[in-house]
Amino acid sequence: MESNEKIQILSDLIQFDSRNGNERPVAEYLKALFEKHGIEAEILPLASDPDHRANLVAHVGTGKPVIAFTGHMDVVDFDRSQWATDPLQLTMDGDKMFGRGVSDMKSGLAAAAIALIDIKEKEIPFDGTLRFLATAGEEVGMAGSTALQAAGYMDDVDALIVGEPTGYNTSFANKGELNITLSAKGKAAHSSTPQLGINAIQELMDVWADIKTKLDERSQKDTNQYLGQDVYNIDVINGGSQPNILPANAEAQLNVRTVPEFDNEAVLAIIDQAIADFNTNHKGEVSREVTMEIIPIEGDLHSKLIQKMQAIAKAAVGKDIKAIAAPGGTDASKLLVDHPIGFPMAVFGPGNFLTAHQNNEECSKDMYLKFIDMYTELFTTVSTEY
């Protein structure tokens, strides 16, 4: 496949407005692309919205080992007025390519798809099966990867490659994440007689103070040598209607990033105990709801997969390739829910992570094309290690 065709495939993907909730057209495009080149692919609609949301699974080869690549088809939202170019058009400026998703992560998706096509058409020999998993909804909720894991598509996988943007590095671990809504019910009263009511905002402040104290104590003790410690913030708070009415209801949204040593379950246990203690000793009522959850993942830093990635990338770019831990989550947290520690998993993909989710998102054209070649070599050689 010529370079201009490789760029055109990425351009085609950028043109799909796949802001979370509209991934099926991307899946249909990839299915047609694969089938044009003799690769069988299957669209798997999501039950929640089958007309607009779907995963895609494709295979090349048969038998063991099974090497899986995963990448997501959705992108984050954008404001056209804040972009220097059309975010739904791939725009070139020298080596820079601009467009929503060009780094996160349609360049990785396109590069892996093209690598499979090259392997198929050139009949490059390899052992086992290459499985391509294109997911819906990674940016919000990870519904696609959750569905693929539940359907058994990870049951026989021996190693997992995640195509999120790392540039010329690779990542083997990421923090987990919890989004938690804290809700407080109080009693309205005139602000001049607060003793007649229950201030719901104050309830939240008191509960959060207790939660934070306990989280601080635990997080300082139970750290991870690669990921550090848990971090947590209240990012949204709502309550009250006007200055002279004691608020009867209040709500706060809490974001927590977790490490294996102080994981989601342990964090929720602390929060639940703090809420129970508060409700026992106060007239108001506080509750919590988990609105999003992914677990922390720690792959094997010394795996054959990472060693192979580092060797291939060093040969391509002439420098040592770092294996790092990342604070952000990926679909691996859902795909590896049954074995989150020690599995041969690595994140390795084209793009500039610093511009992901930003206005004027960009990716290097040279990096994108190099990753196609690196994926082709990786996909066809790493299977000998498993």
PLM features per residue range, with description:
Residues 1-98, 121, 126, 332, ...:
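Acidic/His- and Gly-rich active-site-bordering loop/insert found
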Residues 13, 17, 34, 164, ...:
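Residue-level signal for inorganic ion chemistry
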Residues 37, 122-126, 153-154, 277-283, ...:
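Short helix-capping segments at alpha-helix termini
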Residues 78-93, 156-157, 172-183, 311, ...:
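Acidic-glycine-rich active-site phosphate/pyrophosphate-binding loop
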Residues 87-101, 185-186, 314-317:
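Glycine/charged-rich beta-loop-alpha catalytic/anionic-binding loops adjacent to active sites
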Residues 102-103, 107-213, 359-370:
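Fold-level recognition of mixed alpha/beta catalytic cores in primary-metabolism enzymes, strongest
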Residues 179-386:
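Metal-dependent amide/peptide-bond hydrolase catalytic core
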